[in-house]
A protein has these predicted regions:
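Short, flexible active-site-adjacent loop segments at beta-strand->alpha-helix junctions, enriched
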Residues: 56, 78, 87-90, 110, ...
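Thiol-based oxidoreductase modules, predominantly thioredoxin-like and allied folds used
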Residues: 47-60, 70-80
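Short, internal strand/loop/helix patches
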Residues: 67-98
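Non-globular targeting/processing and membrane-anchoring segments
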Residues: 1-32, 41-49, 62-69, 99-100, ...
Length: 154
């Protein structure tokens, strides 16, 4: 069993995408956020909700994200970021800093299934396909062996 599969996210019951990003005020985070805004209709059509977790205060998120009417859920939960091991200590010129690493996860039945440490179109596509496979796994298993091949194809 993978390390991430042991982490339970009880608040998320459906198959969904969980994204951890740094503060909403950073330029790099805004770039990632824009990428998810582009992917939002695709996830919405598939019925896969996207949860983005920020370390910011809820008021800060509410002010910023009230302009977007998307399928993205904005969450302020620093404890979850710690549980997912997304905080890294860096030393710059002898001074310690905490940096939040951007990561994406597929959540299925309350457990993490897949982790992606890079956020780009290719990585989002990979997790989108994995989420679709998990969401429709029972349908695929049921119909995989029951499909009849027409005699013309023999």
């Amino acid at each position: 069993m993978n390390k991430i599969e042991k982490i339970q996210i009880p608040n998320i019951k459906d198959t969904s995408l969980l994204v951890v990003l740094d503060s909403i005020e950073l330029e790099k985070t805004l770039g990632y956020h824009d990428l998810f805004l582009l992917w939002s209709p695709t996830f919405q059509k598939a019925g896969i909700p996207v949860y983005i977790v920020f370390p910011d205060e809820p008021n800060q998120l509410k002010e910023y994200c009230q302009y977007y009417n998307t399928y993205i859920h904005y969450v302020s939960d620093f404890e979850l970021i710690k549980r997912l091991d997304c905080i890294q200590e860096k030393i710059v010129f002898g001074k310690k800093y905490s940096v939040i690493l951007s990561k994406m996860y597929v959540v299925h039945n309350g457990y993490l299934f897949e982790e992606q440490k890079r956020i780009n179109n290719k990585a989002i596509k990979k997790l989108y396909i994995k989420a679709l496979e998990l969401k429709f796994e029972n349908f695929i298993k049921k119909n995989k062996n029951s499909v009849d091949i027409p005699n013309i194809l023999w």
